[in-house]
Amino acid sequence: MDFQSGEVIAIDKPYRLSSFGALAHVRYLISKKVGVKRVKTGHAGTLDPLATGVLILCTGKMTKRIEEFQQHTKEYTATLQLGATTPSYDMEHEVDQTFPTSHITRELILEVLTTFVGDIMQTPPAYSACKVNGDRAYELMRKGREVELKAKPIHIDELDLTHFDAATMQMSIRVVCGKGTYIRSLARDIGLALHSGAYLTALRRTRVGDIRVEDCIDYDHIQKWLDALR
């Protein structure tokens, strides 16, 4: 493989590692492999630290394809906790509010999910990498500044309920969506539509375009993968 000329590397990002952290580590290993100080490397779509799954890295001239990969359809599996919310819409922050759930049934969930399929408007999380006057929204939030983000048009191709436990009020979904979709925001909006609350307890990106997570390199085995290359 010619990393300096350009390659596409798909890795399975682990839990609690930022996309930039994963990129920096892989870039270091690749640069060491080819014997240069720094191989040009970029990623094609951020995954939250608490999310796992497909992260596409491009090196050299292949970084020009990053936008192309960002346009590809993505598939996720996610688990939601109903009846509560957190400021980040996931488990990065503690629960800040609780809501009734006794009215929530499988039938109601199925009915609500259909309303999110197609072209919809979605407001990104305040704890996100969206820019506000040049600053990242999450950086402003951590400084105690109020952040108001505008709703953006997104497209959801498929939204399936794969599991619902009425005892724990946990539900799992499979989502196929276009660029710019925040699954954390989708969780928040599903909670609102159920006249309750919801936040993510697990998120995994299982596909980007034709690249599936089963075909990705395990992050912990990247050095072994590089060692096997000639």
Cite the ranges covered by each PLM segment.
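Catalytic/RNA-binding core of pseudouridine synthases
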Residues: 1-230
